[in-house]
Structures are given as C-alpha cells and as structure tokens.
Amino acid sequence: ITWNDLDLDAVFDTVDHTVSVCGEEYLYTALRMPVTTTEIREERERLMKLFAENQKAREAVQKALLLMGKEKMNPPTEEIAVLMEAEPGEKGKYLLMAGIAVLGIGLLFVLPPLGVAVLFASMVGNGLMHGRESKKLESALKAFGCILRLQRTARELGKEKISGLEMYQKRLEEQEKQLRPITRKCRTLVNTKESQGGAANMIFAYFHTFFLLDLIEYSSVVSGVKSYEKAILQMAEDLGLLDFALSAASYRESLSYYCRPEFLDEKKAGCRINVEELYHPLLTHPVANSLYAEGGILLTGSNASGKSTFMKNMAVNAIL
C-alpha cells in the first residue's frame, strides 16, 4: 500500500493544525515514516496530553511558534541542506579587492591621479565581482532567515518556564546560545538586503557592493554554519515535535471520539485484531465498523460495498 493508495495528502490536510513550518514538516514526516519505537510514541502522547490539559502551556508554545510561521517558506531541513552544499566563495580574493578599494581612497590624498585610477578600477572590478557572486548570496538568504526565525522562536519559548517541557526548554536555550555567533552575521546579511530602498539605504547598499562586505560576510557565515548543522536541525526537530503535539491535540478535540491504537508484540499476543466503531477520517458521514479476528481472515462483499475503504481505514487509523 502506498501513500497515494491511502490518499494521505488529503489526510495530511485534514489533520494539519500546525502553525509553523517546523511542525508541518514534522507532521508530514510522521505520516510518511510512522515510528515503531515505544519511547517516541509515548513521548508524543505525553506532550499531546499536556497540551490538551494545560491551557497555559498550549498558549505559550503556540505564541512562540507563531514567530516561526510557515507562509511561503521551505522546510528547515531543505533550507539547511542548501547551506551545507553552498560554496563559501573565495574570501581571500574578496578581502584583497576590498583592500585595493581602501588603498585607492588613501592614494587620493597622496597621489590623486593614481588614486582616481585605482578607485575607478575597483569600482568596475568589484561591481562585476559582486554581480557574478551575489547569486550565491541570494540563494542562501532564505536559509539565513530560517536560522534567525528558529533562534527567535527558541528564545521566546524559553521566556516562561512550562511544567512538563523543561527538557525541551533547556535544550533549546543551549542551542540558541550556541548559534549566537553565527546568527549575528546572518542578521547583518538579511537586514542589509531587506533594508534596500530609499536614498540612504541605496548608498548603504552601494557601500557594501563597493567593498564586497556582504560577500565577505557570506563567506564567513557559510564556512562557519556547517559546524552548527547538528544544533540547527535539533532545534528545528524539537520545535517541530512541540507543534506536532499541539496540532494532534487540537485535531483530537475536533473529533466526536477517538482512541489510541495499541500495538502488541505478535510473538507474545499472537496475530489478532480488535477494533470498535472504526471510521475513516476523510468521510463526512462515515459508517463505523467493528471487527475482532485472530489469524488470517477473508474479507468478502459485493462490488462497491466498502471492502477497499475498510482496508484503507485500518491502515490510516494505524498510522494516525
């Protein structure tokens, strides 16, 4: 049975109550690759119960996750993958060409004709260099913005101690502090690009172009961010798990009734299945079915009697 056989795109749209791109990605992954580890399932259930019963925790976490958002945004893992594969560029060359521009300014006060010539050559050379190399920067800016949102969300989540989330808050706080050296540089690059427009900002942008400052900063960030990959991805996963649990708790509250699937060890419990009042989450007016069977069974019925729907129903509910 495949993802399309179970119409899991529609299932995803139905159960998706997430408010951040981290939670959206975590939910999609949870449907794509259901976990069999008891510890992970139990921790997810604990968080769902916490959010269902604790309004203060629910509102505090959701408020923080809204800072991350999910409009027109790629999943964090995709954005970070872009940075991991990005070429940092030739920082030494950028520094040399910026140094020549500074030298030209200095020569204006000693040998004006030579200074003008050096400045003109730097203006042309650095402009061409910036135009050619800035494509790398443009593709990385969204990833830098994603890192900044992750950090801002983690910082907001740590402002208020929430009972039951101490482990996540502590880990996110540690990761947020660990990322500060690199996020300062990310912020400089993002702010420079976002502030374009207006005479003062145009002068500021030209200043960065003339001295290749954003390319120098970009090279430093890309070279340094690779050592923070584990912390960034762990931060995205932790935030995603919290949003996922919030979403699942919200979805459960929208249902007339639900239960937790209980999976038994076949060697200990044998091959059996027991379901009561099972219904498909995509049907508006479903007819619930119950079944108890041990060993193999033969499911029969006339055409269009619901055999396939029942089998898909079993699979979808096992995943959910």
Model-derived features with residue positions:
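Alpha-helical coupling/stalk and coiled-coil linker elements that connect catalytic or binding modules
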Residues: I1-S305, F310-N313
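Post-Walker A helix-loop "phosphate-sensing" segment adjacent to the P-loop in P-loop NTPases
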Residues: V316-L320
